[in-house]
A protein has these predicted regions:
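Carbohydrate transferase catalytic cores enriched for Leloir-type hexosyltransferases
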Residues: 1-230
């Protein structure tokens, strides 16, 4: 059995009863398209097409309950009300199951004018969004791997993520890890990343190095080895 993270491996053993000796962790990797070498002209053209400016807060993934977007929305609302944050929050991802709660929360908090939902973006556009964002916020209650976090690291985008599921092993020390439901902690961490240039620069430089530990060549070699040993 192949698991895409140690967290998934533990779940297969603990929840499904898979024999530990039969479960091998083989990590995924980010598409090289997300590397940090997008040209300024390409990034600027993408921002113009999407009517965005640099420095926005970004969340990537399907809109569904496990992504825990209401917590992010409440933290964002707090920053707008208490700290005067004016940059938009961009939600990039399709509508999943029970997505209505996200839009109900947006309406209840009066955020309709400052939260942008981009339901369909190409990988090339997403790569430019990572390059232009002030930070990626990834507050999921659970991820089996968490490709958006790895993509953002690869692109040199500061990452603030949940400390649940696979995210600690994917993000490592290259991002900030938080309890997923602590609105105060999310507001504080996002404010730090968006306003502390030294912290943001440290995370931008740490991201590609962390992402470099996950390559498709390693994934392919480990998968081939697993098949040969079956």
């Amino acid at each position: 059995i192949s698991a895409d993270s140690e967290a998934t491996r533990r779940d297969l053993i603990d929840l499904v009863g898979a024999p530990p000796a039969r479960v091998t962790t083989i990590h995924l990797a980010a598409n090289p398209l997300f590397a940090a070498d997008r040209s300024l002209a390409e990034v600027d053209a993408t921002l113009t097409a999407l009517r965005l400016e640099r420095g926005f807060l970004l969340a990537v993934g399907t809109l569904e309950p496990r992504k825990n977007l209401p917590t992010l929305l409440r933290a964002y609302d707090r920053l707008r009300r208490e700290a005067g944050l004016r940059m938009p929050l961009v939600l990039a991802g399709g509508k999943g199951w029970l997505y209505d709660d996200v839009f109900r929360t947006i309406d209840a908090l009066g955020l309709a004018g400052c939260v942008r939902h981009l339901e369909s973006v190409s990988d090339a556009q997403l790569a430019c969004l990572y390059r232009a964002a002030g930070a990626l916020a990834f507050p999921s209650h659970y991820e089996g791997f968490g490709l958006p976090a790895l993509e953002a690291l690869h692109a040199g985008c500061p990452v603030v993520a949940s400390n649940r599921g696979s995210l600690p092993e994917v993000v490592g020390a290259a991002g900030l890890l938080l309890e997923p439901d602590d609105v105060d902690a999310w507001a504080e961490a996002l404010w730090r990343v968006l306003t502390d240039d030294a912290l943001a620069d440290r995370l931008r430089h740490a991201g590609p190095a962390q992402a470099g530990q996950f390559t498709w060549a390693r994934t392919a070699a480990a998968t081939l080895s697993l098949y040969h040993g079956a």
